[in-house]
Amino acid sequence: MASDSRRGTGSPKMKGRENAKDTLCRNVTIYGRCRYEDKGCVYNHDPNKTNSAYQSDSKRRLNVDSPSFTPSLLSSNGSSPTSSSATLKKTTTISPKAANAAPFQPRGISSRSNASTPSARAESAAPDWSVAEVQEFVPQGFETSHMASLQGNGNGPVPSTSPFDPFVTTSNPLAAANAVGPVQANPFSPDTAAAALGGATFFTGQTGFQPVQYHLYAPIGPHSQNTLGYQRNVHDLFLPNDFREELQKKAAATLQTLPNTQLPAQVDYFHSLVPLDLNHQKNATIFGFPSWVYKAQSSKDGNFYALRRLEGFRLTNEKAIRSVQAWKRVCNGSVVTVHDAFTSRSFQDSSLIFVTDYHPLSKTLAEQHLSAGNRFQGRSNTHIPEQVLWGYMTQIANALKAIHSNGLAAKIIDPSKILLTGRNRIRLNACAIMDVVQFDTQRSIADLQHQDLVSFGQLIVTLGANSPSVMHNPTKAMEHFTRAYSPQMKNSVFWLLNSMQKDQDHTIDIFITGISSQLMSTFDSALHMDDQLTSDLSRELENGRLVRLMTKLNFINERPEYEHDRQWSENGERYFLKIFRDYVFHQVDAHGDPVVDLGHVLACLNKLDAGSDEKITLVSRDEQSCFIVSYKEIKKALESSFQALLKPTRRVH
């Protein structure tokens, strides 16, 4: 009994398959033949026989005359496996209504039982199939919101939308987040529509952007709108040539000296005098005294100033020269700033010196538009456009506004005393001189300010007629001015010329109100000019940084005084700094000719300053040593070597 019980609980013997002769042997499928075919293998070894048997069986099973499938009822869940097999009732007959029964279609799948449910209960559960509940497998359409974040600490979900585009924003972010995404086709479906997509399903469009390169120049606006995205010109990379030449010429004019001159070596605290007058003939028309203009350098601050000298002036009242103190408070962009005034005998006479700002390469309006000082006297002057003339009027009005607000009067508004310091940029000059020269003249400030307005109108008429003597015939001058310019310009000039009338109130504030529209135009032009200068300045912003890098490299490389110093050896990090210098500046082409490439130098220095992870190959001059280092390592070596250079003087061992 014991042996029988042990035999009953042993592993059951594997039963042979009844349809083994119709099953194709796996060895034939895998290896092409079965080595056990003649040694008792019971499976089929003829693939053709298997296919024919399968086709015949399919024809028999898919016959339209065959009855529909009617599953038998299983036992209840509570019955045991033995009792259920005993009481299982098999249907051996077919109902007459089976001919009209609908074909079998799966309806749904039942919910799976828990892991703790017995296997018999799971087998007895009635399956309920539903195709609609089974989701198709779509690789590109999976929901990424349920996945952990691939970046950061994993707390946030991966966004299911497309990559962020800074140039395309949604008007309603909440609506965009809740919106249903587009339905993608199933690439594994045999549908012809999905097949027509080809490879487009697997290779969707990518709209990612590269990160900002902080070691490159930042393109600050304004930007040119008439070029395409891939087009570049020289002005996009460097300072405009005309602007650069203008600045260089002004710098050269500022530093200009005149050796072997008969001018005094020093006038008070100024030295290095250079005459600025184009006409060497004495002219006392404006001030009543011959005047000369010099450029000089101050011994106090080292800056350059313009000195206007009134020859032969004798100061009789000390209060007269103190009136210049009021002009020091006038700080306006359209007025040349007055810094000081003093008398001097450095020119072997009694002279009055006025110290003002120096604007290199500046011209007067008379030299620019009235042929004053021009060697081609017979050449006719060009007509001044109305917009340029409006610009002059707004700037002079700005200057008079500042002067009159301080209780002063310009007294001199003459084309020969108005400086053109830039393109259509003018400044009133020599304003404080008449306050000293005519100090004893008794005249009210209101009358002097009205006279400024009249002189203002005469200046505009003179510039519009392109002739300095046009005011000798005012009627003819106004006829020409009326034909050449708009009615608004004509009315403004008429208003200025009639400022001396007592029956009307004429102030510079009323005049500014009348030309407010032109003031806005000039202000807009000034804003555009400011944007342009800011853009040009941004291109030169990094030049100092690159110069510092080159300076550090030259400080470190090839120092002969430390050649035998053990602490300053070029075998370590300083050695590939030396080779890096050759890599940047001493490259040659395939023919051995030097490569002069400014772009290569700028790119290398920018990457060095940023500490990029990009690696480069450095080869020694004898081609016996080779280093593969990154810009980050080179930057670290550069900083450590430079800091070591700044340490106290070391002793040579």
UniProtKB/Swiss-Prot annotation:
Regulatory subunit of the poly(A)-nuclease (PAN) deadenylation complex, one of two cytoplasmic mRNA deadenylases involved in mRNA turnover. PAN specifically shortens poly(A) tails of RNA and the activity is stimulated by poly(A)-binding protein pab1. PAN deadenylation is followed by rapid degradation of the shortened mRNA tails by the CCR4-NOT complex. Deadenylated mRNAs are then degraded by two alternative mechanisms, namely exosome-mediated 3'-5' exonucleolytic degradation, or deadenylation-dependent mRNA decaping and subsequent 5'-3' exonucleolytic degradation by xrn1. SUPFAM superfamilies: Protein kinase-like (PK-like) (SSF56112). GO terms for cellular component: P-body; PAN complex. Residues 1-21, 45-128 are annotated as: Disordered. Pfam families: Pan3_PK (PF18101). Residues 517-555 form a coiled coil. It is found in: Cytoplasm. Residues 68-95 have a biased composition (Low complexity). A zinc finger (C3H1-type) spans 19-48. Its main location: cytoplasm. This is PAN2-PAN3 deadenylation complex subunit PAN3. The N-terminal zinc finger binds to poly(A) RNA. Contains a pseudokinase domain. The protein kinase domain is predicted to be catalytically inactive because some of the residues important for catalytic activity are substituted and it lacks the equivalent of the binding site for a peptide substrate. However, it has retained an ATP-binding site and ATP-binding is required for mRNA degradation, stimulating the activity of the pan2 nuclease in vitro. HAMAP family: PAN3. Residues 256-516 are annotated as: Pseudokinase domain. Belongs to the protein kinase superfamily. PAN3 family. It comes from the Eukaryota. ATP binds at residues 308, 357-364, 416-417. Residues 556-653 are annotated as: Knob domain. The keyword Disulfide bond does not apply.
